[in-house]
């Protein structure tokens, strides 16, 4: 689009749904009220270096919840009480689960707290505390 450098890579967290708001902005169309996400146009044009997204929250049915903050991604599977932790900077393909490593215990607890706050903000009623009583 106009004002956007070709082949310019941006390493900032975003939501996939931001693409809709961005497409509408590029097209010059009015954004409908139901489009809740943000346009990435200021980021793409170099007007800002940050997306404004501090934590990426993920939910898949009643089967999975996740949060990504900085280099860390925590994925919880409440039906089987399984947690997985990845350093996505060092391990972008998420091959080495660090959840059982004693050194990452504090990281997991911090991300879990953040995930609970994001659940509340998104009116997500899935009870993670019952499946993960030791994380809180």
Predicted regions and their residues:
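C-terminal cap/loop subdomain of S1 sulfatases and analogous C-terminal strand-loop tails that border
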Residues: 3-6, 12-88, 93, 106, ...
């Amino acid at each position: 689009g106009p004002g956007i450098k070709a082949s310019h890579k941006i390493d900032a967290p975003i939501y996939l749904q931001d693409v809709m708001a961005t497409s509408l902005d590029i097209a010059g169309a009015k954004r409908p009220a139901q489009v809740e996400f943000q346009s990435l146009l200021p980021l793409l044009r170099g007007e800002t270096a940050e997306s404004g997204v501090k934590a990426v929250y993920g939910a898949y049915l009643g089967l999975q919840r996740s949060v990504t903050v900085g280099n860390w991604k925590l994925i919880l599977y409440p039906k089987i009480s399984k947690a997985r932790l990845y350093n996505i900077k060092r391990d972008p393909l998420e091959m080495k689960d660090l959840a059982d490593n004693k050194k990452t215990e504090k990281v997991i607890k911090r991300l879990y707290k953040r995930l609970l706050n994001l659940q509340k903000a998104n009116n997500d009623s899935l009870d993670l505390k019952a499946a993960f009583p030791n994380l809180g």
